[in-house]
């Protein structure tokens, strides 16, 4: 019987790609941190802005993010005091899907991960045992339902059930990547709406609330009969783009398909109301996309393609090829969830994309690293959201 025990060491080391000396492969968000000697909440102290050195090709370099577009991560003295006196009513546990992200969240919050033993039996069954009391506690379980999707989903359900049976006061499922989110409607006869089924399973297991990052479609929130906090990862990516010193006059935001226009429009609005272009495509099968034509002007521009998921990368790469054909100077791909199913890496590293910017909502295997890849951490965003949910404070104000 294989086993995996997830515990927190007495002191948490900051991951290398969160430090100021991060490698070129792992470029973190330009959010900076301040810490104190005692274990306390880590707070955001500022954001990097575009420098204003001199004009480039006749266009002044101006910040593409201003003070009104930056989320105000608030300092709560009450919460900090709570942590400093070892608040036992807030518990954070990690599943096995993305323990690195869970540890970063705990580091941001000034907490230690709860102790839990997760085992795999020889026949594939999953066993979960909490190694500390959660009676009367506000419990948050961090577990993206990424590959292997069914196994990680089942693990989450069993963790929720274990917390409920251990008399936790509230159980929140923190799902950075929500598997089956793309199965949110019927496109052909006799199909299942698996996203609704998964929502039912999580609810019936005993979860009181769900936190999810950049759901494929907004209507998925309505599939749950419990509250859902939709965490938008745009601030992390926007902050990183601000550090690129791209002239706002040279920028165009591109939606890789018609279905993502609303997402791209919201993204463009934050980039000084950058112009919008749309790639029109026709899908002939699952994981197969064909680019048809481009709506909008990208000639001589820096094109930023915005999507929620990169799976096989067919949509992104074919879109990038079309943008180059239409005269785009550079093409960037910005995506929250890096699924990277084969042959995604071969396509993304082919040279069509200047940079592929993703987040760590699900782990990226080392074998899938390539020179153009940049991974940003959403730990701050999730940690702040968890604090606000625990404190009964506004979550939506983070993204306004």
From Swiss-Prot:
Belongs to the ribose-phosphate pyrophosphokinase family. It is an enzyme of class 2 (transferase). It catalyses: D-ribose 5-phosphate + ATP = 5-phospho-alpha-D-ribose 1-diphosphate + AMP + H(+). Keywords: ATP-binding, Chloroplast, Kinase, Magnesium, Metal-binding, Nucleotide biosynthesis, Nucleotide-binding, Plastid, Transferase, Transit peptide. The keyword Kinase applies. GO terms for molecular function: ATP binding; kinase activity; magnesium ion binding; ribose phosphate diphosphokinase activity. It holds the Pfam family Pribosyl_synth. Its EC number is 2.7.6.1. Mg(2+) binds at residues 214, 216, 225, 229. One of its GO terms (cellular component) is chloroplast. Residues 1-44 form a transit peptide. PROSITE patterns: PRPP_SYNTHASE (PS00114). The lineage of its organism: Eukaryota, Viridiplantae, Streptophyta, Embryophyta, Tracheophyta. This is Ribose-phosphate pyrophosphokinase 2, chloroplastic. It is found in: Plastid, Chloroplast. One of its GO terms (biological process) is nucleotide biosynthetic process. CDD domains: PRTases_typeI. Residues 300-315 are annotated as: Binding of phosphoribosylpyrophosphate. It comes from Arabidopsis thaliana.
């Amino acid at each position: 019987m294989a086993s995996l025990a997830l515990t927190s060491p007495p002191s948490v080391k900051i991951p290398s790609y969160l430090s100021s000396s991060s490698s070129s492969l792992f470029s973190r968000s330009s959010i900076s941190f301040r810490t104190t000697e005692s274990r306390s909440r880590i707070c955001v102290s500022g954001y990097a802005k575009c420098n204003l050195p001199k004009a480039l090709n006749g266009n002044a370099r101006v910040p593409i993010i201003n003070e009104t577009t930056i989320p105000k991560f608030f300092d709560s003295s009450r919460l900090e005091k709570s942590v400093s006196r070892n608040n036992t009513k807030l518990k954070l546990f990690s599943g096995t899907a993305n323990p690195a992200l869970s540890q970063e969240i705990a580091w941001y919050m000034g907490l230690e991960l709860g102790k839990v033993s997760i085992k795999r039996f020889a026949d594939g069954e999953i066993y979960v045992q909490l190694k500390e009391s959660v009676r009367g506690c506000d419990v948050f379980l961090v577990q993206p339902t990424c590959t292997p999707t069914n196994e990680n989903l089942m693990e989450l359900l069993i963790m929720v059930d274990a917390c409920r049976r251990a008399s936790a006061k509230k159980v929140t499922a923190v799902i950075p990547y929500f598997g089956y989110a793309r199965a949110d409607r019927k496109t052909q006869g006799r199909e299942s709406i698996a996203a609704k089924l998964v929502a039912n399973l999580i609810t019936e297991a005993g979860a009181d609330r769900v936190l999810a990052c950049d759901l494929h479609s907004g209507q998925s929130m309505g599939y749950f009969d419990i509250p859902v906090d939709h965490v938008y990862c745009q601030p992390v990516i926007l902050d990183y783009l601000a550090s690129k010193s791209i002239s706002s006059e040279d920028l165009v935001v591109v939606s890789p398909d018609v279905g993502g226009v609303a997402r791209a429009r919201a993204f463009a609005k934050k980039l000084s109301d950058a112009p919008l272009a749309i790639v029109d495509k026709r899908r002939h099968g699952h994981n197969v996309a064909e680019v048809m034509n481009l709506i909008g002007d990208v000639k001589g521009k820096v094109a930023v393609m915005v999507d929620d998921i990169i799976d096989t990368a067919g949509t992104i790469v074919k879109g990038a090829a079309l943008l180059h054909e239409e005269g785009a100077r550079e093409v960037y791909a910005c995506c929250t969830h890096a699924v990277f199913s084969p042959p995604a890496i071969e396509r993304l590293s082919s040279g069509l994309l200047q940079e592929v910017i993703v987040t760590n909502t699900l782990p990226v295997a080392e074998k899938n690293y390539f020179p153009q890849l940049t991974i940003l951490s959403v730990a701050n965003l999730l940690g702040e959201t968890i604090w606000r949910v625990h404190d009964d404070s506004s979550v939506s104000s983070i993204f306004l």
